[in-house]
Amino acid sequence: MKSKRLIGLLLHTALPVWAFSQIKGTIVDIHQQPVEGATIVMQLPDSTYLEATISAADGTFMLKPEPESYQLIVQHLLYQTRQIKGRAHDVGIITLEPKDYNLEEVVIKGERPLVKVEDGRLGYDLSVLSEKRAVNNAYEAISKLPGVQESNGTLSLAGASSLTIVMNGKPTTMTADQLETLLRNTPVDRVEKAEVIYSAPPELHVRGAVINVVMKRSNDYSFQGELSTYYQNRYFSSGGANGNLRLSTPKVTLDVMYGADNAKIMEYTDLFSRHTLGDKVYEITQNEKLSTKSWMHNVRTALEYNINEKNRLNIAYTGSFTPDRNGRSIADGSFQQSTLDKFTENKMHNIAVQYSSGFGLELGGDYTRFTSDNNQTMLTQLTDNSENAYTLTGGQRIDRYSVYADQKHSLPNNWGIGYGVSYLYTKNYDFQTYNNVTGNIKPENTDAKLEEQTTNFYFSLSKNWATGTSFTVSATGEYYTIGNYHKWAVYPQASLTYLKSPQHIFQLSLSTDKTYPGYWDMQSSVTYLNGYSEIQGTPGLRPMTNYNLNGNYILKQKYIVGLFYKHTSDYFAQSPYQATDRLALIYKNTNWNYMRMIGANIIVPFSMGNWYDARLTLVGMQARQKCDQFFDIPFDRKKWIFVGTLDNTFKVGKNLSFELTGNVQTPFIQGTLDLASTFNLTAGMKWNFAKDKCTFTARCSDIFNSSMPDMKVRFKGQYLDMNSSFYTRTVSLNFTYRFGGYWWLAHFSRFCHLQIIDIQQYYEAMYRDTNP
């Protein structure tokens, strides 16, 4: 025992000794009233305990040690715990958020804010938003954020012309689909928060609206894991399994993930075309059935290494493999009967490296390799007994390299500046070769190589006031080249957050952006879908330029009212066109003059007791779409659209909850297309059991098969009807098992008051762990 005491004494005396200066601050609630009796624990960044104290009646506190950098843990029975990192001797005002607490017969009620605003970012705790909802991964939780809507696998944000997802505030060379796959395999409890940003700051190296998914960092000794499996029925039955492991110490955190999915999809489309060719009108009916089956394997390994308390290194590998994707399209109608078989193999590898320093410098690099090989066979029999047929061998090779460097400086009086540079190089190779071609079709072989380079450099200026008001302005210069196309551009960005009080927050943001077309869209190629429909490439397709102005008013950190204006020059979209020289339905991306949208949105959460929570989201806007060069039928169209979503959550007991979500959208337009109204009703349940180690969820999405709009064209002689609202109802079951936990030594009582641990016991325990 004496030797253990001596070891504890030696270790204790080996701790750094600081001058007798003091760390001070003030604890207040959301009404700026002092909080008495809050426990403040001071630690080093590696979680080494230093000292603890209690806030006084006026909310003030003082701590004697003053290390170069530290973290404070602030706790109180009636408020949510906060963790703050600092370097200054005066940490200023620390605001605590209230929480609900059930203490035997006494119920102390507090209301958790829906959103927290910091530096112009709307921060949401995903674990809180999804704790009662039937969500099974980070992607599904993001789709439940206020103002966010998912449609056909694409996320959109009310008031934004486009939406980009990033992880940990840094860019990636993975595509949106590849990032979605990663998030669908990421547990919700690995995410610290999601930040909604209407005007992304330049250090994110993306522009426009962004959702930044911030992953949790661990400074404790722990081993945690999660195993899950799911079943899904959407005409076909599908399923999969996923495993996640995390091993963490104050120095190193290792994450490993593997998932396997057996996906089977059925799509069905009814088409009626009244096709005018010369002086004759042909009525063409067609039913198309597309089935796809595949296995997908996803793997990710991420290592975070804390070099010291100031420097951190992150390395991650992500892989996605689809070795045997088989698809068959069968079209049967009055004009033709066709069968198209397609076999595809896809592989994706991504490596990302990030380094963060203690003096504001961040460096990073990212590489993605994507390969796709496909073989197609098509046979078409026309009503005049002629045949069209071909076999095709094609593929795509993409290499993307990205590097960036960012630097921030803190100036006196809470001013700040930032500057940085990024470079993206992409090499793309597309090819397709037709063989055994017969009939009245003239396919062209394609062998195209494209090199794309994007260089960005930026400068930003920011200011924060003690009241919480802040603003940031920046300008990003960009030099972009693809093939023989070269373009210089400047993108301004600005955001202002005015905090009259925590109950009244105003936001204003301006952003500009460019969206570039896909590589395949710019090829002079034709892809035959069947004997009537085809997709044409568009050489010379120009990028679209987006201008966005957003304003938000946030009341009581819950209710959000927003106004927005969006103008997009050279907007491009794919719209159908009935050819005038032959019986063919052409799908082709074309540049419009512009698309303009102006509107408003409102988000209203409400609840009744502890058993019912709901959120109402309403969006109304007018769109104007103009194109002078859409084949031979230019258009200039306007349309009002309204979207309403009501999320309902019913809590039955502590561990069981049900949800019911309804979404309705009024008719809309896309070029010459008229889109009918849609309605989506989804029901689900969530059951936690085995001391919250197990979770079972069940959900039925799109109960009435009405989430896909009927489409029609009635414009300048074009007459077309398309109905794809088949087989969209989806039933899914998910089971998740969580295991592991913390090996840490600090203990807190059930009432969140610190239990003082003798320093000898602390080091004795550490000695036992390291010397078994």
Regions found by a protein language model. Give the residues of each.
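Short, acidic, small-residue-rich periplasmic hinge/interaction motif at the N-terminus
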Residues: 41-43, 75-79, 91-130, 150-152, ...
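A short, solvent-exposed loop/turn motif at the edges and junctions
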Residues: 43-48, 71-85
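Short, acidic Ser/Thr/Gly-rich low-complexity loop/linker segments typical of extracellular
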Residues: 45-60
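N-terminal periplasmic accessory domains that precede
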Residues: 92-95, 138-141, 179-181, 195-196, ...
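Extracytoplasmic beta-strand/coil segments of soluble accessory domains associated
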Residues: 139-174
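Short acidic/polar hinge/loop motifs at secondary-structure boundaries
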Residues: 172-199
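Face-selective signature of the C-terminal outer-membrane beta-barrel domain
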Residues: 252, 296-322, 341-492, 497-503, ...
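Outer-membrane beta-barrel signature, preferentially recognizing the C-terminal barrel domain
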Residues: 514-563, 567-569, 585-599, 604-607, ...
